[in-house]
Amino acid sequence: MMRGNIAQLMQQAQKMQENLQRAQEELAKLEVTGSAGGGMVSVILSGTKECRKVRIDPSILNDQEMIEDLIAAAFNDASNKVDTESKERMGSATLGMSLPPGFKLPF
């Protein structure tokens, strides 16, 4: 009986590892847009939080302080969206198994 449980656990662990790998690959391809100032500034991040592009409306180019604030806000917006996507994708990849507190995915 015990041997069957161990084999089943090993199969689940292998399936979870495959699912995590697939989810990480999907996240690497993902692009998320964060925006601020009613769309005057937008930041595009990859699923690994690599900044791919920053767009700034030309109408605000003379206000450096506003641009700085809006870039930070747009980046944070995109970062939060990546976190949400990551949690959803990694959560489904772990087959519903709960992880210990503070255990962060991807590794």
UniProtKB/Swiss-Prot annotation:
UniProt keyword terms in alphabetical order: Cytoplasm, DNA-binding
An MF annotation (GO) of this entry: DNA binding
Keyword Nucleus belongs to the record: no
Organism superkingdom: Bacteria
Localisation: Cytoplasm, Nucleoid
Pfam family, one: YbaB_DNA_bd
Keyword Cytoplasm: yes
Gene Ontology terms: cellular component: bacterial nucleoid; cytosol
Main location: cytoplasm
Stored HAMAP family: DNA_YbaB_EbfC (MF_00274)
Functional summary from the UniProt entry: Binds to DNA and alters its conformation. May be involved in regulation of gene expression, nucleoid organization and DNA protection.
Subunit structure: Homodimer.
Protein family: Belongs to the YbaB/EbfC family.
Designated name of the protein: Nucleoid-associated protein XF_1808
